[in-house]
Amino acid sequence: MNHAIVEQIERRRASIIGFLAGLVRAASPNPPGDTRRVADLIAGRLRATSVDFQVLSDEPRKPNIVARLGAGRPELLFTSHMDTVPVGNPKAWRHDPFGAELVGSRLHGRGAADAKASLAAMVAAMEALGTVLPLHGTLTLTAVSDEEVGGVKGTEYLVDRGILHPDHVVVGEITANRLATAEKGVLWLRIVTHGRAAHGSTPWEGSNAISAMLRVLDAIETQVGGALRGMTHPLTPPPSLSIGTIRGGVATNVVPDWCEATLDRRTLPSETIPEAVAQVERVIAELHRADPTLQADLEVIQSGPPIETPLDAPIVQAAQAVARRLELPDAPVGYQQASDGRFFAERGVPTILFGPGQPELAHTVDEFVDVHDVITAAKFYALLALRMLGGADERS
């Protein structure tokens, strides 16, 4: 059966690549996050198979597709996202960002790697598996919206409404077809400093909120950033802290009474989100104790815990076996960015990441994916599903 599935995917190579090209041409930058064209293409593809699916959403522009094969437990979830980051300056691109140009084996375009390649491969795997029913359990595929801006209308929507109850999760993200078992957590913070407005010619009559913010940010970078230096994890990159935005003031000749900054903090699997928040809270509290006139508020914009799936988890063991079958590296790696996997990992569901595309190409100009890697990923997903849900013969 394994050989037959691999051969079936190989025979459909041109169709799979053409499907991916169509997904790339269906622009879905977020913001605004309208993924209806992508969802229509996926729905059309699934409609031509034996796969049952639903389109679920509480916002029409941001649909989510939930497709299922088989029934009962265990449930294996394949998930990836339909939205992309914006193009930026189109003139900076050598290839039309929505042209899906195939140059050699490279298919170019926004979302080609992140993450429409994974989507195309997962759909192809489900198509192939639809010919070998019954499975011993359920294979679920979700093609979600809103991942690039936090997943509220996508995976979080599906999880919070009890639509998904997987026992194992595979997140389609750009890992260069490497098995990733760990991922850094994400924490976005907003800091607001308060001052007192005055005329720019008499700043001593006011209190400058931007100056206060500079003190706050300098202390955070020095103390929190300093504490992060030297921290490591065997799989993920180091923890990080970055000032993302800053704004304040209304005019050059007015002492600003308000300033806002946002921070991007990425945590190691060995850290917790509450600990990371407390680090920043302590810095602000110390500044206020030293100078009670300094007023700063801290708010969590969004957060997601890190992922670290044990290497003896069945999904990891199965993924390693499939990687060896396809002559791929089987040593686990870490994933640098954040993914929708956090919604499952925080609920204790064993979660891994795997997908075609080089991680360094995410969100870049002239993004591309090697189509050979897309076909390999489709084979990986299909063989993994067979190993998890195909019965004892397929696990041997």
Task: List each language-model region with its residue ranges.
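Short helix-capping segments at alpha-helix termini
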Residues: 49, 131-135, 163, 286-293, ...
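Active-site metal-coordination/substrate-binding segment of hydrolases
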Residues: 75-140, 365
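Acidic-glycine-rich active-site phosphate/pyrophosphate-binding loop
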Residues: 87-103, 166, 181-192, 321, ...
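Acidic/histidine-rich catalytic neighborhood of metal-dependent amide-processing enzymes
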Residues: 115-188, 389, 393
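Metal-dependent amide/peptide-bond hydrolase catalytic core
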Residues: 1-4, 11, 54-57, 181, ...
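A structural signal for isolated positions on well-ordered beta-strands in alpha/beta enzyme cores
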Residues: 54, 77, 140-142, 297
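N-terminal helical capping/dimerization or prosegment-like subdomains
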Residues: 1-90, 105, 258-262, 279-282
